[in-house]
């Protein structure tokens, strides 16, 4: 299991939400897709082409440790710890800001932008920097070519 990223209380504060329940396990990652959710992940119920709120109960069935949902979400049987916010995307952005603020002042962040070649460039940077600083380089597992890729 991964080391816990958040306590439930810190998650609620960072998201600017209201707690509904308590998280029964360490919160170790994030997911916006129940197909890739791992036990302990925090599920974020985003609305896009589909409404993530339709998948909250499924996320808990797959082991989600908590979910960030709209304040208007109606709790279902089987739901676990909820963080109720006005807008789940804004809540996720708050969590991202809080996570970034936890970085050491010595940490460096590299952003790769553009219309072609981002994934290859990211992977090349990760490989090169990992040689210089083994175990100290972090990169997204995949590209998130959307508005929540780097909230």
Task: Go through the PLM ranges and name each one.
Residues 1-94, 98:
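N-terminal leader/targeting and accessory segments in enzymes
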């Amino acid at each position: 299991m991964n080391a816990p990223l958040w306590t439930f209380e810190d998650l609620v504060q960072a998201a600017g939400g209201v707690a509904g329940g308590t998280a029964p396990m360490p919160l170790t990652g994030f997911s916006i897709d129940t197909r890739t959710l791992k036990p302990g992940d925090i599920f974020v119920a985003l609305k896009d082409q589909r409404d993530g709120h339709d998948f909250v109960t499924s996320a808990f069935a797959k082991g989600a440790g908590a979910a960030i949902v709209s304040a208007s979400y109606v709790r279902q049987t089987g739901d676990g710890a909820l963080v109720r916010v006005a807008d789940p995307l804004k809540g996720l952005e708050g969590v991202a800001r809080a996570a970034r603020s936890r970085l050491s002042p010595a940490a460096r962040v590299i952003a790769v932008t553009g219309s072609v070649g981002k994934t290859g460039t990211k992977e090349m940077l990760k490989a090169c920097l990992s040689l210089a600083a083994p175990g100290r380089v972090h990169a997204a597992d995949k590209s998130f070519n959307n508005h929540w890729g780097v909230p």
